[in-house]
Amino acid sequence: MSGARSTTAGAVPSAATTSTTSTTSNSKDSDSNESLYPLALLMDELKHDDIANRVEAMKKLDTIALALGPERTRNELIPFLTEVAQDDEDEVFAVLAEQLGKFVPYIGGPQYATILLPVLEILASAEETLVREKAVDSLNNVAQELSQEQLFSDFVPLIEHLATADWFSSKVSACGLFKSVIVRIKDDSLRKNILALYLQLAQDDTPMVKRAVGKNLPILIDLLTQNLGLSTDEDWDYISNIFQKIINDNQDSVKFLAVDCLISILKFFNAKGDESHTQDLLNSAVKLIGDEAWRVRYMAADRFSDLASQFSSNQAYIDELVQPFLNLCEDNEGDVREAVAKQVSGFAKFLNDPSIILNKILPAVQNLSMDESETVRSALASKITNIVLLLNKDQVINNFLPILLNMLRDEFPDVRLNIIASLKVVNDVIGIELLSDSLLPAITELAKDVNWRVRMAIIEYIPILAEQLGMQFFDQQLSDLCLSWLWDTVYSIREAAVNNLKRLTEIFGSDWCRDEIISRLLKFDLQLLENFVSRFTILSALTTLVPVVSLDVVTEQLLPFISHLADDGVPNIRFNVAKSYAVIVKVLIKDEAKYDALIKNTILPSLQTLCQDEDVDVKYFAKKSLAECQELLKN
């Protein structure tokens, strides 16, 4: 599709020509030139050697169309764009395809929408995947604007042209357009013809076309599910044949798409209350789960809970899925085990018999928790704790807790992090006491991990844990740890630790913050405060806490400490004090009557002093904060 840019359409003068009018030209010629200008300008820009310029020009199509008006857009711009669509680079085509999907208002409304179809059909046949995808999206957008008559007279023939073209690219695009017509066709014979055409595509020789068929089939089935009274048995004969083509294809890149197709088919029959096909569909599910191609097994594993949910009305069907599920847990491909590890709790909830969970599922979980692949163990850790909701307290303590505690000691940090992040449900069932002995060492070890990103991750989990574990446990076991992060060697960790204190205050309240955090920060060793970084960190922490503590705490504890740093020897400290003052005034102004004197007699004079500072940065931030404070007082 790409190539040298065309210099045809020479009948329209260039921008340079149209922008210059002879002094001898009459008014009529001048008006004519001005009316040609937008299109001529676009043409000039689309002849530019630099592709970036041509792409930018194409992004302005809507502006050009507005300038031209609907009639000239239809008669001049669209024919010109049809030429461009056959003679430029893929980057330009992609923008053109996307723009045309929003073009119906610019050509005069839906009654003229079919004029956009030929150029989009050209783009939908492009070699470049991105161009085709943009064109298909735009065609589907335009189709929504079409009347029934336009749909039948123009859009359906367009699908037929693409579906019967010689090139696979056109056929792939055709597959993405059926969704715009499948439920708008009320005539059974016409819909049958459409499905027959889709079946024809499913029998194509090229895997690319068959993949497009498999990818789009669930969308078509879901549309029929939303319109249950529309489809006939004959429609489903076609759909069944298409599904069989996909599930029996010899290419795993086609066959794995059968999993989503099967789920959609099951949803349709479940919505209809029709169980006559369920056993056959279960057989198809088992076939896919045990397929020799690992990609097919992976897809079945990844969708296992969704698949199982479609059989949940009959426990006998669920029971038939237990062994295939266990086989996936022992699959020789790590990616398959990783996918199914995330599905354990989701599948187990469909098992009515706790003994199956205890005797079959938990042993599989035990094996997965010790899997040689750390990504499998991490995947299991991210989802497994919900299984406790299916067991009583004694069963959790005796059968599941040992697995969980072992995972809290896993050598891979992500496993421990994922378990810690999802402990609330376990805590709700068995209480924190049984977890604490293993939980605290895991948290402490993660908090000291040499990888700062691991330390960052555990900091981000702390507020979640705080909500789960409660204030008393937190104060006894974790508050020291939270303060210790303020002195980390990595700035990002110190910053995260400061924000962490704010989130904890939002959970536990201002009084807790005053007693457990602020009082300890203000009692730090004077020798420690000789370090600039320590002073800066405490200043940053106290400033961050200003919006989440009571005004009394702000005025009695935070403000005095911050103010005494106003004459600090380090300019960086002084200008951060200036910024802190603005934060403090912003909260004190909520009770201006009470704190007006404090603001005017303490904060503003200090800011005015800082405005005279010898350091330019201090002066800049002091003046900025002073202006903010004065504006707050004025309002």
From Swiss-Prot:
HEAT repeats lie at residues 34-72, 73-111, 112-150, 151-189, 190-228, 229-273, 274-316, 317-356, 357-395, 396-434, 435-473, 474-512, 513-553, 554-598, 599-632. Keywords: Repeat. GO terms for biological process: meiotic sister chromatid cohesion, centromeric; mitotic spindle assembly checkpoint signaling; regulation of translation; spindle assembly. One of its GO terms (molecular function) is protein phosphatase regulator activity. It holds the Pfam family HEAT. Residues 1-33 are annotated as: Disordered. Residues 1-27 have a biased composition (Low complexity). GO terms for cellular component: cellular bud neck; cellular bud tip; cytoplasm; cytosol; mating projection tip; nucleus; protein phosphatase type 2A complex; spindle pole body. Gene3D superfamilies: Leucine-rich Repeat Variant. Belongs to the phosphatase 2A regulatory subunit A family. Each HEAT repeat appears to consist of two alpha helices joined by a hydrophilic region, the intrarepeat loop. The repeat units may be arranged laterally to form a rod-like structure. PP2A exists in several trimeric forms, all of which consist of a core composed of a catalytic subunit associated with a 65 kDa regulatory subunit (PR65) (subunit A). The core complex associates with a third, variable subunit (subunit B), which confers distinct properties to the holoenzyme. Present with 16900 molecules/cell in log phase SD medium. Phosphatase 2A affects a variety of biological processes in the cell such as transcription, cell cycle progression and cellular morphogenesis, and provides an initial identification of critical substrates for this phosphatase. The regulatory subunit may direct the catalytic subunit to distinct, albeit overlapping, subsets of substrates. This is Protein phosphatase PP2A regulatory subunit A.
